[in-house]
Amino acid sequence: MAREEKPRKVILVGDGAVGSTFAFSMVQQGIAEELGIIDIAKEHVEGDAIDLADATPWTSPKNIYAADYPDCKDADLVVITAGAPQKPGETRLDLVNKNLKILSSIVEPVVESGFEGIFLVVANPVDILTHATWRMSGFPKDRVIGSGTSLDTGRLQKVIGKMENVDPSSVNAYMLGEHGDTEFPAWSYNNVAGVKVADWVKAHNMPESKLEDIHQEVKDMAYDIINKKGATFYGIGTASAMIAKAILNDEHRVLPLSVPMDGEYGLHDLHIGTPAVVGRKGLEQVIEMPLSDKEQELMTASADQLKKVMDKAFKETGVKVRQ
């Protein structure tokens, strides 16, 4: 008699706009069989759990409930979206000190619960908070992953797809580096059906500046949304659910994530956005893309900026680390 598989269990920490959108996306797509939600606003979570469960008759069965940290013990995945939101005029890096303190109050009780699964960090600044989660938790590097440039890459695919009149899913393109102001597109690789976007632009008699215009548009998209409606959540909530699905379903999928550097791009001791393979055991492989000299300079500059802010924030906040 075949042994019944354990239901896939996800704990979400943070039930704000991003967290609740992630939860709704998980319900809509039928990802995981159990979803516990933790937030300091306990009544709000209870209401959200009931509301989300009301969608299950038209999606798939799922146990959804207001959770607490001991519930993390047997979870497969803990997703962290909790943190101070980015306000108009702020960069993601401006959030670092306050969100490091919030993160510390989350990671410690999750680890103390006996959790042996995978951390997926979504809160900003995601590269720094992912590295901090790894250091605070004492977990192996393959069990701490950040959403990285997944949203930025999706935005880039959307813009290129619109320009070339193709479905964004047919665009092979990546944004690399920090999920923030120093991110950059890998134009030496980015293509549609093998035709580099740079060559397509040239063949259609567009100025070379078109590539920089696209870069700027993608980089500024979050600021535009925040200025207009106060926050971004649909894109990142859906992207995060996609990452969760790839992990829980053991897809061995290549995604642009915030992952640890161990010599890739000449970088060490930080997490930054690059393609990586993920599956049921977490991070399986970090992919070092071949970059042009200019792109390598941009990657180094992005890493330098992250390290500068991270080192300063770690000293100022006095965050306790296990490694």
UniProtKB/Swiss-Prot annotation:
Cellular location(s): Cytoplasm
Superkingdom of the organism of origin: Bacteria
Binding of substrate, residues: Q86, R92, N124, P125, V126, D127, D152, T153, G154, R155, T232
The enzyme's E.C. designation: 1.1.1.27
Main location: cytoplasm
Residues annotated as the enzyme's active site: H179
Catalytic activity: (S)-lactate + NAD(+) = pyruvate + NADH + H(+)
Protein name: L-lactate dehydrogenase
Species annotation: Lactobacillus helveticus (Lactobacillus suntoryeus)
Lineage: Bacteria, Bacillati, Bacillota, Bacilli, Lactobacillales
Protein's gene: ldh
